[in-house]
Amino acid sequence: MVEAGGARRHRMTLESGDHTLTLFAYRTGPFRTILFYALTVLTLGIFRLILHWKQKWDVKMRMVPCTFEAAEYIYIIDNHNVSELQPVLRKSNATIPTENGEMRKVPELRWFVYRKLEYVWIDDLNSDESVDEISDNDNCWKTSFEIANRIPCRSLLAVSESNFGLTLSEISRRLEFYGRNEIVVQLRPILYLLVMEVITPFYVFQIFSVTVWYNDEYAYYASLIVILSLGSIVMDVYQIRTQEIRLRSMVHSTESVEVIREGTEMTIGSDQLVPGDILLIPPHGCLMQCDSVLMNGTVIVNESVLTGESVPITKVALTDETNDSVFNIEKNSKNVLFCGTQVLQTRFYRGKKVKAIVLRTAYSTLKGQLVRSIMYPKPVDFRFTKDLFKFILFLACISGCGFIYTIIVMIMRGNTLRRIIVRSLDIITITVPPALPAAMSVGIINAQLRLKKKEIFCISPSTINTCGAINVVCFDKTGTLTEDGLDFHVVRPVMSAVNQEIQKVKLEKSNRTEFMGEMTELTSRNGLPFDGDLVKAIATCHSLTRINGVLHGDPLDLILFQKTGWTMEEGIEGDIEEETQRFDNVQPSIIKPTDDKSAEYSVIRQFTFSSSLQRMSVIVFDPREDRPDNMMLYSKGSPEMILSLCDPNTVPEDYLLQVNSYAQHGFRLIAVARRPLDLNFNKASKVKRDAVECDLEMLGLIVMENRVKPVTLGVINQLNRANIRTVMVTGDNLLTGLSVARECGIIRPSKRAFLVEHVPGELDEYGRTKIFVKQSVSSSDEVIEDDASVSISMCSSTWKGSSEGDGFSPTNTEVETPNPVTADSLGHLIASSYHLAISGPTFAVIVHEYPELVDQLCSVCDVFARMAPDQKQSLVEQLQQIDYTVAMCGDGANDCAALKAAHAGISLSDAEASIAAPFTSKVPDIRCVPTVISEGRAALVTSFGIFKYMAGYSLTQFVTVMHLYWISNILTDGQFMYIDMFLITMFALLFGNTPAFYRLAHTPPPTRLLSIASMTSVVGQLIIIGVVQFIVFFSTSQQPWFTPYQPPVDDEVEDKRSMQGTALFCVSMFQYIILALVYSKGPPFRGNLWSNKPMCALTIFATLLCLFIVIWPTELVLKTLGNVELPSLTFRIFIVIVGAVNAAVSYGFETLFVDFFLLGYWERYKKKRSIEAIIDYVPTTNSDHIRRPSINGVTSSRTESTLLSAEGQQLHMTTSKNGKGGENPHSSALFERLISRIGGEPTWLTNPIPPHSLSEPEEPEKLERTY
């Protein structure tokens, strides 16, 4: 999408895949360029370094805005606010593709490269056109493969039929434009990586610090910091290099391929492939090196590398039924062979090879998109990181105050200029600890090692801290909450008037269609004849294939086929061989029953399963039939879809009742139907799918059991007890999802669930689809009183044929026709907890037609069913927008997009697609989720603790130095070394050794470093430490044996030893140990202190050593540390007592005031006030909505969404779903107000929101003022 004005404007918005890019055009100016280089030289490169850190300043400083026609650089900002500056490249007399894929010449080609994709400028604007006539497609940047986005299917078919391929000149032009077909991860030079690492702000500050220390003759610690920093830089570069090498080895692949060029088959390297090439697929498989469309035959591929689904998939050829349409990779995915997928087998024409036409190459392929998502991951948006820099800024402000104080005091004391400069700069290095980055990583590294021991692998360590803030977990159902496979339960055949005579079964009423009883076997011994249509449909309607003698395919198909006991062969046999060869059809599969050796059925045509169509079909031929044009279509799919395709006269009246009954008990249902076809082989191979998948005859239901994994219930209850919201996001039936949700604890059986549904085609007066709220019957057998005006059970209505026989009409023999649910009538149904469930189609309706309610529904819905992969991703992003920290757990099949979008994606698949998720568990169940969260909480608390410890250490040393600067003194090098190298370094290294607590706490840890509690803790400890040091500093000067410090005169060698310095050093030693113990938090997020045995040992040893240094210092100790002996033993004991009092006061302040009062009472009080404000805020009238501004139909105010999110989180924290939580008096009030906006008459039905009030955008300036 392009803003009006196209090339004549400076700014442009571009939709590129899943990202929205904002582009700005710039060019260099001579004056700005001269000024830039002058300032860089005058500041010795510091100015250039600052611009490197702030690229936006760099652009503003060096360049001037211009039109896109004159642009030399493009400044790009993505939807995560990550920016890049890329040069515009130009080439004269070049060729580019047109929309239909043909190449044409242009006077000049302009492009830039962004994240491995080339964006080409398309300029079709005539000079006489006005600005208003510029369309989105006339002038814009497009990727090289987005240009040819309207290739007609007939063009592809024509290329395939011609069998000529590209000419050498065409290949040369396309290779020049598209480039080589290689996914190459360039290894950046080691020197470049080293330089980039060194010039980061922290390391630049370290360079500044060690420079100051060397000038101050503090060489030992400076050298230690240099060594540690160099080691850290080398390790970081090594890890980056290792990841690049690993990624390159994983994705880089080239091999020889066969193509048709200029009518000749030839073998070339895969890196020479270009779009438009005719590719020959070998019969015994290969690794696809590009995205291509299959033109003939069928191909069996394994797409686990991209989707995580290890089940082989059958790809079919593009047919002429799409002749008039434009080819679309997403819609025609069943015809596309994706790069990186493994071709297992091809079924080819006799004497011919399977052909495919190359569509996309290199990074534009689906595999290339996955690689780019790994190379350029979504930045972790976590407040802790932002607060970290703000806190460092706070420390920098303190150091600024100390800087001014030092200059003033030292000028007053008459110090030399060099000493004033060195001491004032030294105070900055003391206040902002250079070792902070290394210390901060300790907790994350330890958590990562502990996760690895539990077979949970993390490729993004920075995500571990984010896991500590997780408050909602989304689970896929199949393979995640439930077992990966399905077990056969029963079949329910349909006995209709049409097939009674065939089955030789006499019913009481021959004109009725009804279900037979449950049958657990698919054999004649169980009442089903071996050649009954239901058995034949089950045996033939599947996508199984035989590879090396072994059946492969969807596990569900495999289970059902094996249940029939039939056999399958692939090849042409019998009388149909000649007919098949005549019409050049693909070799059919031969299905044979075991009970009759003479019978066999040939699968002539297969319509593969489509998630959008929710069904698959096959055309079957029986060679025993007299007529070769007597074929049968068998279809199977979701009960709803097959019902919509069936002749109503063949469907039992209680069909929906039976379907809902099974679904509510957690069974997965598959409906089966048939249709006789009067087609020959030629027509069967060419017929369109829509022409035959209609007017079907219902055959029955297959009932499959999807068992919940043994650990699922315990894990969900564990999360519920921890007040972590659990959400099911599944592609399965809504009622099946509800049943499994109840069984695994996401919805408690004793609680009522409400279904949010829509009725297609039923519109309100403003043309929007009506939404209804219905109460669901519990999966248990508890009886719920039906109130027709309050709740409509989904299984209470039945389908009855109309008297005219013209189809179904919904009627209800038990309750009234469904009516909207009002808030008043629902009031008595709402207890302390409630659950909402919604299906994907209804969710899509609400997103498009009622966008103002999306946030509220996402805050309270617990089951999202029939969700497509893109809807799963959309849901995760929606939860993130309303301030949830989201984890997504899936088995990799159709969950990749959601796993990538979540704050913490946890994959249960060991497929290569799992590299898109930060966490991968080798144990394929959800027990890893609480482990990841608990380790994340422990790491987060450790990061908080170690940061406050390092800040406390810096401020403690700052206070000590401020006292000594007053007398123109400073700590000796030995004292600094003992503090920095022994006490601080050792405690920082062992701080993160404390393991996570064995169970999840009911409340999450604090996530705001700049919260009142955190700031009060640091400032409070600073005050306590400052007071204690002042007492010791002042008391030392009052002793009768005290000798004042004599500062050096002019350039005299400075003797840093002093009694007051020794006294402050002695008491500060205990303070550093006290800070480590105070900030080393234990339960409920980390283990007890004694669980960290190394730190316990260090604490004991350091305390004893400090006592020895203070009370019984030897001559060696005095000389090494630079201490002055304090003559009085009583005073030395006094220092120890003061340290003990300091410990008691610090621990009491942290425990009683910070933890108990601020984090306990005060936080609960604020939450209570916020909930009361939310209840008063939620609007219940139509006018509330109309007043709220919107942009393109989406509410522009996020205030209500954020408040409702906080309320939704608080409801889950206050009321446990295990039934043991306390009553939440606000749950009913919020729910009633929400219901009044969903199905209540006050909002949607009697006074709905006018659509124009939601879709008319306001000017940005007005919106800003509204906010």
UniProtKB/Swiss-Prot annotation:
The chain crosses the membrane at residues 33-53, 190-210, 218-238, 391-411, 425-445, 951-971, 977-997, 1014-1034, 1059-1079, 1098-1118, 1133-1153. Its EC number is 7.2.2.-. It is a multi-pass membrane protein. Mg(2+) binds at D891, D895. Keywords: ATP-binding, Magnesium, Membrane, Metal-binding, Nucleotide-binding, Phosphoprotein, Translocase, Transmembrane, Transmembrane helix. Residues 1-32, 211-217, 412-424, 972-976, 1035-1058, 1119-1132 are extracellular. It is found in: Membrane. One of its GO terms (cellular component) is plasma membrane. GO terms for molecular function: ATP binding; ATP hydrolysis activity; ATPase-coupled monoatomic cation transmembrane transporter activity; metal ion binding; P-type ion transporter activity; polyamine transmembrane transporter activity. Gene3D superfamilies: Calcium-transporting ATPase, cytoplasmic domain N, Calcium-transporting ATPase, cytoplasmic transduction domain A, Calcium-transporting ATPase, transmembrane domain, HAD superfamily/HAD-like. Pfam families: Cation_ATPase, Cation_ATPase_N, E1-E2_ATPase, P5-ATPase. This is Probable cation-transporting ATPase catp-6. It comes from Caenorhabditis elegans.
